[in-house]
Structures are given as C-alpha cells and as structure tokens.
C-alpha cells in the first residue's frame, strides 16, 4: 500500500520531459566551465594580480584533454582554468583558435578516466523547427539546461574581427537567467 501512495504522488513525466532529462544526464559530464584571467601589475606595489576577464562554457572533445569553447571566452587570457562537472580544475593551454569562427581549442592534462568526451552528431538532417537543448554555465552558474528550436539554417553573422561566418545554425533558446 505504501508503494501505491508513493506512485500516486510522484509526478508523471511525459516522453519529451524524460528525453530532456536523459540528454541532460548523458551530456552534462562533458560540459566544462572556462574562466579567463589576465595578469595585471599594481602601479605602486608592482605586485602581480590575477584579474578575472571572462568566463564561458566548453565541452570535452576527446579523452586526450581537448576542450572546445568560444574564442571570445579566451581572447586575451594570460591564464585559462577549466572546471569539470566533478569540481576538479585544470589549467588549460590554447592549442588553436579560429577568431573568424569564434572557436578555440584548449588542452588540459587530465587523466583519461575522468574525461567524458561529448559524442558528436551530424547536422545534415537538421530542419527548422527541430528541438535543440543547450547546456551551459551562464554567469558562473553551473550546469544550466535550456530548450529551444532550430530557427534558421545557413545564416551569416559577423565575428569579433568583423569577418563573415557562413552556414550558421540559428537557434532560439536562452541560456542566461
């Protein structure tokens, strides 16, 4: 009888909600928090301070420690820190950038067994109206999920250095609070 009462009060998940939860639980370990600091020397004491410059989200590309993030997140950094979902932190080195595509590739030295690379998909079957999920760390809030749709395909936008980025997938989901 106790089991019946527990089941009666537990909320039922619709299939879409159950799928969202499953995707979130599967992908979250692959999402990382990226912080960018710059070194500044104080004028009078000449002490060197680490000043937070920015933060963002990235994902684990492979078990060799490669991380993909946005170029604007790491631009101008003297030091880049990666926080895994487990709370473990690692200093990262930039191994490649594409400012015109707003992409940066970072590398951390972490044991393979603690890294969870994100399985990659194929965008060929995307269509306007398809559901999308985004997991990020807005304003240093950890592991936020948002749901939206593909709004358009093949868009062109301007990068930080005013170059055109072609074939962009436009989505409608807000990750910020």
Name these PLM-found stretches.
Residues 1-177:
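Serine-dependent protease modules
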